[in-house]
Every structure is written in C-alpha cells, then in structure tokens.
C-alpha cells in the first residue's frame, strides 16, 4: 500500500473547507464553512477570484467552466455565479486573500477588495431547504438539479437547470418539475436525505439518494419526462432499487462514469458498490467492503473508473480500486477531519479539503 505526500497545499481559506469541484481546464473551485468561494488557477497554484457566495456554510459546489459555477449553501440558497476573466491575467496575493475575508467579517472593505469581489456576479438563485446537510446534485446532460424538499427533509425536489438562465425572474423559487420524491411504500421510514447524485445512461436519468436510515434508493425516469412539470412524481420516477446497506446514515453516493456502478459510504466503516438498475430485471445484490475506517464522508470516482477516493473523519484520504474495492493508498497530511474530495477530469490529480482550512493536492496512479 502506498503512503504518498501532497505535492502542493493551497492555504487561501480561513475556515473549514467544505466543498471542492474541478473543471477540466485546470481550475479548482473551493467553498468553506463561512460561505466564501475561491477559484484557483492550478497552472500557477494561485487564486483568481474570491467572493462571499453564502452567509452560511457551503454545502456543495459544481463547476461548469472557469467562468460559471453553481453553489448550494445552508442559507437556503442555490445560486449560479458568473466570473469575469482576471484583469491582465493577474492573480490575488495570499495576503490580500486573507485580508478580504477578515475585512468582510468586520464589515469593512477597502477599494482593492471591492474591485476583486465585484469581478463575480450572481446570475440566478432560488430558495431551498436549510434543515439538512445534503448538497444538491446537478446533471447538465439531463438539464436537472435535485435538492431536498423545501419543507420535508425526507423528500426530494427536481428543478429545471436550464430554465434558470432567466436572470430577470424575481420569484426566487426556480422552476420545480417534480416535488416530494420519496421511496414509499417500498420503505416507510428513511429519515432525512443525506446525499444525492444524478446520472444519465441512454435516454434514462438515474437519481440515487442515500438516507439517514442507511438505505440507498435508485429512482429512474425518462429524460424527456423528467424535464416536464408533473405534480405526481410517481408518473415520472420509479423506484428500481431500495436496499438498506449501511448500519449508520449514508454520507456519500457517487456514480461511476461508464462502468455501470455507483458507490456509497456511511458513518459506519463500509464502502458499498451497487449496480445501476435501469430496470428491475437488472437488480443485483450490492457488494460491501469493510474498511475499518468509519466516517468516509465524501466519495469520488476518477474519470477512467479505475480508482475511488474518499475523505475521512480521521483526517485521511484513501484510494480504493473501483473494481476490487481494495485499499491502494492512504493520503496522510491533514491534522483535522477531511470534509471533501475531488478528482480532476482526465487526470490523476486529487484534491482533499479539510477542517484545518487547507486543500492538499496529490498525484497518484
């Protein structure tokens, strides 16, 4: 088993790093517990943008490009942000990066800080549930965005992603397509939704949800049907798979890219591989691996479907074989809990975000 060291550490945040997202052109987005977002240019390992995206902790980040990123915060907002290119290709000095966050905390901002922060503007936002720690899920291929239900944390709402391009709307509620998805009557009690993910295969969209009860549920719908408003979700989404595979709340669910599997982790010490069920005939029993490490709260699969990376409560990242689930490496650097992980598309570059406010970068396999 390999025990590597990080080749670089990013130190821009002043609070716990809670979410990470790569885009393919060497850009990394990071969000923290105070609602701050930073856009990093990894070609020079320097920040290009910083802004206060939310007034509370950031739950999720989805980078579309170096100019567009979605964020989900505990302040009841999902927002899309547009970033202006850095003036003259300039980057923000680390000292100024920290000063901006401190100035905002003290309600004082200098002219230089305001210039930097104003290079980012909000293109659209809508209100959502803040009673859960579950982040959103986005699928540009399906044109869908999924979040916990506005009122009931045990249910899910589906929104149109592309409809949110209308920045003149003032209702702040988004275009909700289906609402209150839940696995009843197959499962009566699931507890709150803990993690969600979306995947498109052929003309089907698969929505997987991990619940507080330890259940993992796969819903499936035709892409065309899911993109239309329907007040009865049962007419659009079908439960194809519902299994209680964890003894503790599910912390993360993630799809492989093209290997026909999805993976889940939990507050227990198991990682579970599930077959993607496009029909009830394709249902197979899940495969579990006891890792001996409870609380692997973020899973990510590399774009070649060969490795799986986790971020753990014990401050360690771990690399597993996506096929065998065997542990291949331990990423040991952080002094506190690792909250999030990300893998750059088409690369072996891994990022880990921690409660110690640092982001470690690794190149492995």
From Swiss-Prot:
Its main location: nucleus. GO terms for cellular component: nucleus; TTT Hsp90 cochaperone complex. One of its GO terms (biological process) is chromatin organization. InterPro entries: WD40/YVTN_repeat-like_dom_sf, WD40_repeat_dom_sf, WD40_rpt. PROSITE patterns: WD_REPEATS_2, WD_REPEATS_REGION. It comes from the Eukaryota. Signal peptide: none annotated. Keywords: Chromatin regulator, Nucleus, Repeat, WD repeat. WD repeats lie at residues 12-50, 53-91, 188-230, 245-284, 292-330, 333-365. It is found in: Nucleus. Component of the ASTRA complex involved in chromatin remodeling. Component of the ASTRA chromatin remodeling machinery complex. PANTHER family: GUANINE NUCLEOTIDE-BINDING PROTEIN SUBUNIT BETA-LIKE PROTEIN 1 (PTHR19854:SF1), TRANSDUCIN BETA-LIKE 3 (PTHR19854). Belongs to the WD repeat ASA1 family. This is ASTRA-associated protein 1.
């Amino acid at each position: 088993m390999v025990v590597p060291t990080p080749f670089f550490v990013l130190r821009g945040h002043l609070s716990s790093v809670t979410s990470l997202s790569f885009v393919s052109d060497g850009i990394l987005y990071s969000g923290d517990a105070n609602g701050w977002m930073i856009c990093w240019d990894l070609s020079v390992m320097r920040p290009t943008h910083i802004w206060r995206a939310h007034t509370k902790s950031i739950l999720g980040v989805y980078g579309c490009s170096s100019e567009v990123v979605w964020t989900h915060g505990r302040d009841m907002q999902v927002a899309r942000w547009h970033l202006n290119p850095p003036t003259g290709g300039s980057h923000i000095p680390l000292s100024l990066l920290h000063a901006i966050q401190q100035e905002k905390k003290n309600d004082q901002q200098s002219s230089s800080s305001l210039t930097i922060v104003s290079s980012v503007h909000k293109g659209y936002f809508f209100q959502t549930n803040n009673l859960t720690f579950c982040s959103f899920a986005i699928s540009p291929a399906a044109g869908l965005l999924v979040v916990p239900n506005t009122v009931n944390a045990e249910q899910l709402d589906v929104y149109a992603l592309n409809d949110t391009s209308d920045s003149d709307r003032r209702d702040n509620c988004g275009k909700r397509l289906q609402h209150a998805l839940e696995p009843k009557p197959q499962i009566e009690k699931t507890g709150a939704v803990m993690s969600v993910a979306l995947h498109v295969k052929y003309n089907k969209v698969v929505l997987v949800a991990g619940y507080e009860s330890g259940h993992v549920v796969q819903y499936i719908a035709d892409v065309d049907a899911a993109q239309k408003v329907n007040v009865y979700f049962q007419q659009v989404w079908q439960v194809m798979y519902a299994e209680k595979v964890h003894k503790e709340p599910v912390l993360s669910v993630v799809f492989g890219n093209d290997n026909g599997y999805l993976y889940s982790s939990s507050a227990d010490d198991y990682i579970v591989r599930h077959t993607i069920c496009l029909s009830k005939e394709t249902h197979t029993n899940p495969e579990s691996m006891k890792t001996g490490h409870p609380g692997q709260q973020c899973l990510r699969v590399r774009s070649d479907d060969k490795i799986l990376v986790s971020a753990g409560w014990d401050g360690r990242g771990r690399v597993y074989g996506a096929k065998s689930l065997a542990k291949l490496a331990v990423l040991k650097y952080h002094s506190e809990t690792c909250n999030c992980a990300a893998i750059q598309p088409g690369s072996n570059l891994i990022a880990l975000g921690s409660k110690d406010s640092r982001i470690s970068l690794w190149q492995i396999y």
